[in-house]
Design a protein with these regions (language model features):
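N-terminal active-site segment of His-dependent metallophosphoesterases
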Residues: 1-58, 72-78, 131-138
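Metal-dependent phosphoesterase/phosphodiesterase active-site architecture
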Residues: 231-296
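Beta-strand-turn-beta hairpins that frame and shape the catalytic cleft
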Residues: 1-5, 93-104, 109, 226-232
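Conserved beta-sheet core of the metallophosphoesterase superfamily
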Residues: 55-66, 99, 177-260
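Active-site-proximal loop/helix segment associated with metal-binding centers of metalloenzymes
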Residues: 104-161, 171-191, 260, 269-273
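Active-site environment of divalent metal-dependent phosphoester hydrolases
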Residues: 12-15, 44-49, 69-77, 94-95, ...
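Active-site neighborhood of phospho(di)ester-bond hydrolases with catalytic His/Asp-centered motifs
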Residues: 6-8, 37-42, 63-69, 87-90, ...
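Glycine/small-residue-rich loop that forms an oxyanion/phosphate-binding "nest" at active or ligand-binding sites
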Residues: 75-92
Length: 296
């Protein structure tokens, strides 16, 4: 028996993670008796920073990874899909045990979660607001996504049917995990176009031996959901100003009446020393909530 730990959306650069913070994660993995770590994308914005993190954890325990959209902005298309590292799992598997395989897939999005009908408007928003405007890829987003989903179908069909498969990906595979905003925030629903692909989830539905799917990207944490016969787990770490510990810090110190994560960075800088002290006391608990643990 072993225990898989999956972490998505570490964002070590945006979150200003130090060597001490990474060591805290390593200690948490050890305390929970993790025997394999998989990093499910958005480790860092830059390839070198991401690989430094991967190297750190590989010195602690077996560690694999695939990319999220943030690393992709620093990579050519060939390196996005086929990165020359044996720990890179994009349409590759690693045997966790005699009966359990871990399959990693970067994934992509096809606008299937958007409330907009106009592809032109979706692309306008992408180029105006979305980080992925910096990613250079061949083909349209729906074309790329469909190719990936078809490759997933063929990959799953080619795996031994007597093995249980744990799939890790970065993007959202099921509409259950898409939050629909209302009121003055309803316009944010337009950006759901870039969160994932419902077709990816439909391909998973075809496979009888996929035990669990783990993903992130949405920066929202959910309770595990069983859809069909598969467990879906989404608990990304996300940005520091989105964390639960940050929410508690702001509200406990009465720094604002309304918790709006995207407007907190200046407020936190003004109270940096106090926030750093609070974070040091509560980061371990935040990390514990943002790791998916799977016994195998």
């Amino acid at each position: 028996m072993g225990k898989l730990a999956v972490i998505s959306d570490l964002h070590v650069d945006i979150n200003h993670f130090s060597a001490t913070d990474l060591q805290l994660i390593a200690e948490l993995l050890d305390a929970n008796q993790a025997t394999h770590l998989h990093l499910a994308g958005d480790i860092a914005n830059k390839e070198t920073a991401a690989m430094t993190v991967i190297d750190f954890f590989q010195r602690q325990l077996p560690t694999t990874f695939h990319w999220g959209n943030h690393e992709m902005a620093d990579l050519s298309e060939s390196l996005i899909e086929t990165y020359p590292d044996p720990a890179f799992l994009n349409f590759q598997t690693v045997a966790l045990s005699e009966k359990t395989l871990l399959l990693g897939v970067n994934c992509w999005y096809d606008y299937g979660y958007s409330d907009l009908q106009s592809t032109e408007e979706i692309l306008r928003l992408k180029h105006l607001f979305w980080y992925d405007r910096m990613i250079q890829r061949t083909g349209t987003d729906p074309e790329i996504s469909h190719q990936i989903n078809e490759r997933l179908r063929q990959t799953l069909r080619g795996l031994p049917q007597d093995k249980e498969v744990i799939v890790t990906t970065h993007f959202v595979p099921k509409a259950t995990f898409i939050v629909k905003q209302t009121g003055k925030y309803v316009r944010w629903n337009h950006l759901n176009a870039f969160l994932g692909s419902p077709e990816f989830g439909a391909v998973i539905d075809e496979a009888d031996n996929v035990r669990q799917v783990v993903f992130g990207h949405t920066h929202r944490r959910f309770e595990d959901q069983v859809i069909g016969q598969t467990i879906y787990s989404c608990r990304p770490l996300g940005y520091y100003y989105e964390w639960q510990l940050t929410r508690r810090f702001v509200l406990e110190n009465q720094l604002t009446e309304n918790f709006q994560p995207t407007k907190l960075r200046g407020l936190l800088r003004t109270n940096q020393a106090a926030f750093n002290q609070y974070k040091a006391a509560h980061l371990r608990a935040e990390l514990q909530q943002a790791i998916t643990w799977i016994n195998y």
